[in-house]
Regions:
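Serine/threonine-rich low-complexity intrinsically disordered regions
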Residues: 1-7, 97, 149, 291
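Hydrophobic alpha-helical segments
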Residues: 16, 57-59, 102
């Protein structure tokens, strides 16, 4: 009987010590958030801000005691903030690299990642530019500096130098261009302009007839069009072809359907990277984005959801 009593006391003390360690960790971190309440900050590549803002607004409306504050920055800084413990959630265009994951594990963390959506990189040009089709090969030659004038791509064009416009030197769009289009090589075009944010890219292209901007497709949709078939009317969106010689017949714009069936070549995955040992609000928000409601928000915004079934219907158009 005495041994049994001592065993119960020992187990009780062990549980109490475990709880004290957990509580002390929370106090040290200064965090009081739960899965669906509290206040946290998270980092996101700025190119994803339109869709993340929609998710955030609905999440906070659904969970009235939760507040998730976005820090919109470039992808490199967002991941750095996560690795350095400044945030527990980062929204990026790539998964953890193995050395990043191992670095966190070596510090006794348990990093997690999940794909939450698919979007596309869109090429935008000035309304005065009538060159509507471009191939992946052409894009590669522009970014590598082999093609520096519009006449190099479109013989006879008088538009002069090709000015390539990105949102930020360390953004996810630049990383995609270097990793997926240039095969891991840096952009060497002599005429590259890096602005501070995506909205500035659109403004620059609107005012510059010989510019070509590279942005995330979630910035394109006209908010007045619930079908997501109308792009921003102040710029032109180019059709992109996998075939070396682009024509209207083999080139596609970043509509959902062409992203879904693989015709549009410049698609990418949006990731939620987590390093949250407390499994609090960062987990709650990222799981909301992955939920049916969160995935429907993504679908309605013109992007492709990761979860759920997508139904394709043929529509017959008649002129009455």
């Amino acid at each position: 009987m005495r041994k049994e009593t001592i065993s119960y006391i020992f187990v009780g003390l062990a549980l109490l010590a475990s709880l004290c360690v957990s509580c002390n960790k929370k106090r040290k971190d200064g965090r009081t958030d739960t899965y669906s309440s509290g206040v946290i900050s998270f980092a996101s590549d700025e190119s994803f801000s339109p869709i993340i803002e929609e998710e955030r607004e609905i999440f906070e409306f659904t969970y009235q005691q939760a507040k998730v504050n976005p820090i919109y920055t470039n992808e490199s800084d967002a991941i750095s903030m996560l690795l350095n413990g400044k945030v527990c959630l980062a929204i990026t265009s790539r998964d953890f690299k193995e050395n990043e994951r191992q670095n966190l594990r070596d510090r006794r963390f348990n990093p997690r990642s999940k794909a939450i959506a698919y979007d596309a990189l869109a090429l935008i040009i000035n309304n005065e530019n009538t060159d509507s089709c471009i191939s992946v090969k052409d894009i590669k030659e522009i970014l590598s500096g082999k093609a520096t004038k519009w006449g190099d791509i479109y013989p006879g064009s008088k538009r002069g130098d090709i000015i390539v416009v990105f949102d930020n030197k360390k953004s996810s769009t630049v990383h995609f261009a270097e990793d997926s289009i240039l095969g891991g090589k840096p952009i060497t075009s002599p005429n590259v302009v890096a602005t501070k944010k995506t909205a500035d890219v659109i403004t620059y292209v609107e005012k510059t007839p010989n510019a070509i901007g590279i942005i995330g497709s979630n910035w394109l949709n006209d908010k007045r069009d619930s079908t997501n078939l109308t792009f921003n009317k102040d710029i032109r969106v180019m059709s992109v072809s996998r075939i070396d010689e682009a024509t209207p017949a083999n080139s596609w714009k970043p509509y959902q359907y062409y992203m879904y069936n693989g015709n549009y070549p410049l698609t990418r995955t949006i990731w939620a990277l987590l390093n949250d040992p407390l499994r609090g609000l960062p987990w709650g928000f990222s799981n909301f984005i992955s939920s049916p409601k969160g995935q429907m928000i993504i679908f309605n915004a013109g992007l492709l959801p990761v979860q759920g079934n997508i139904t394709i219907r043929d529509v017959k158009v008649t002129n009455d």
